[in-house]
Amino acid sequence: MRIALVVEYDGSQYHGWQAQTGLHTIQQAVEFALSKVADSSISVVCAGRTDTGVHATNQVIHFDCEKDRSIRAWIHGANTFLPKDICVKWGKEMPENFHARYSAVSRRYRYVIYNGAIRPGLLRGNVTWQYRQLDHRLMQQGGQCLLGENDFTSFRSVECQSNTPMRNIHQLQVTRHGDLVVLDITANAFLHHMVRNIAGVLIAVGSGKHPVGWVKDVLNAKDRKLGAETAPSYGLYLVQVTYPKEFGLLQNNPGPLFLWEK
């Protein structure tokens, strides 16, 4: 039996998603909880391996288990054993050809910036703080040259292990909601640190450090050294993973909860 679950987590206190010996990770916490419910060892596969400090409102995972458990039992049972900053939101039994990572057709991230003179208290760890005034309209304008299929060498980390730098960005929007500036981006897949490097470049444009046309120059250069500083991890959220309709996976509100839909 193959089960898919949608997981939400605050990544502030974790060394990313992927299990690593001697480190506190999301995957290890999730597998521990599910193994308790199954009364046997469970290994999970996720849609997107988020980095240290990165959050998710709708991470999708799958696992195989022969134990007879209802979806309700998987959800509520796992939540009993999970720490308070991780929860399972939704679940469904899936066909054997479903794969949380390889069946996905797109991933959507939101990068949230608190743009105010004083650093935030309540939202610390959940937003990136920029005290310099950002013009979200310039950021929006600059980001449009990244749409479509491009070589994103300038926006990948030096540790990126992907075989190709080619990625297809489906949509990119930068909006302002009071003191919050939100980068909303969807692509078929993302390179290591790609969203944070895009955010860094757009922040440089929004603050007036570079002109709008510089974004295109960075893209064309295919050289990571010519881009901006990588934006911090703690403003980044994996908010949606899209699959073919045949799998019938629910599309939840992207979130995070302190944002509102426009």
Curated annotation (Swiss-Prot):
Gene: truA
Catalyzed reaction equations: uridine(38/39/40) in tRNA = pseudouridine(38/39/40) in tRNA
Alphabetical list of HAMAP family matching this protein: TruA (MF_00171)
Protein name, UniProt field: tRNA pseudouridine synthase A
Role this protein plays: Formation of pseudouridine at positions 38, 39 and 40 in the anticodon stem and loop of transfer RNAs.
Record-linked CDD domains: PseudoU_synth_EcTruA (cd02570)
Species of the source: Legionella pneumophila subsp. pneumophila (strain Philadelphia 1 / ATCC 33152 / DSM 7513)
GO BP of this protein: tRNA pseudouridine synthesis
Family according to the record: Belongs to the tRNA pseudouridine synthase TruA family.
Recorded superkingdom: Bacteria
EC number: 5.4.99.12
